Swiss-Prot record:
This is Uncharacterized protein C553.06. It comes from the Eukaryota. It comes from Schizosaccharomyces pombe (strain 972 / ATCC 24843). One of its GO terms (cellular component) is endoplasmic reticulum. The chain crosses the membrane at residues 188-208, 231-251. Pfam families: Ribophorin_II_C.
């Protein structure tokens, strides 16, 4: 029973080692050069719902201000972006990076013609999401920021008008170094690894059978508890290796493996 509670406590501790991002003090401002504009307003992120719709026209600027929080403290993430995607065609999307300074204070400014022509011509609204993440995280922090309605004034529409020749004209060369695609594990090695994990678990069952005659697993003595704890540590290590092979990233595996190593060390010292 004690071993069960220790394992449960370790899992909670290891989960805390995996950093989680959040944002605080977030505001969305829509400002206009026209002081009499009715569209200018200021909203807190907490006031914005997924169904909230706000309009962006030719002379208005969308400003986002927020603070990136990592485990309760302001910090600079590796990525902080505003994602705009067509509501009816989600694959049609664009990402705008936010500028993040010391303490996690971030800001982003977006004008109408910063948005690609393909999105300006869309008849549907644009879904806005704020994404914050760091390397090693499989799922970024995502915050919905409502729907953005694009209203291109007739006097400016020619700037956003689409022409078939645009698809044929020379495009600007974008210089970017992409990381190589991840290497796929060798099929034979995958089978060997899976077999070794299963065989090790069978071996652990044999060790457990040898330990049973020597001690009462329900005894409160330190010797029997250490054997139970040691066996549980090895079993958790085997299960952890299998989960790592199937779903965990190397960063998550490192956090969990450190806790398992501590458990094994405590058990070995107690024997």
């Amino acid at each position: 029973m004690k071993g069960f509670f220790l394992i449960a406590g370790f899992l909670l501790f290891a989960r805390a080692l995996c950093a989680s991002w959040n944002v605080e003090e977030g505001t969305l401002q829509l400002s206009s050069q026209d002081l009499e504009s009715e569209n200018a307003y200021d909203l807190k992120f907490s006031q914005i719902q997924s169904s909230t719709v706000y309009e962006l026209t030719g002379d208005e600027t969308l400003n986002l201000k927020f603070t990136c929080i990592l485990n309760g403290t302001g910090a600079i993430p590796h990525q902080a972006h505003l994602l705009l995607s067509d509501t009816e065609h989600p694959t049609l999307a664009v990402i705008y990076p936010a500028s993040v300074s010391q303490g996690g204070v971030a800001s982003l400014e977006l004008r109408l013609f910063d948005i690609p022509t393909s999105l300006l011509r869309s008849d549907s609204t644009l879904t806005a999401k704020l994404l914050v993440a760091s390397f090693g995280e499989t799922i970024p922090f995502s915050l919905p920021l409502g729907q953005l309605s694009i209203n291109v004034p007739p006097s400016l529409y020619h700037k956003a008008e689409f022409s078939p020749l645009d698809e044929l004209s020379p495009k600007e060369v974008i210089l970017h170094t992409f990381s190589p695609p991840p290497k796929r594990a060798n099929y034979f090695l995958s089978i060997c690894f899976s077999v070794s994990v299963v065989v090790s678990l069978i071996g652990l069952l044999g060790v457990w059978q040898k330990l049973l005659p020597k001690s009462n697993v329900y005894s409160v003595s330190s010797s029997s508890f250490a054997r139970t704890f040691g066996f549980a540590s090895l079993a958790v290590a085997e299960i952890l290796l299998f989960i790592y092979w199937t779903s965990l990233s190397i960063f998550q595996f490192g956090a969990y493996a450190a806790g398992v190593a501590i458990m094994c060390g405590i058990a070995a010292k107690s024997l």
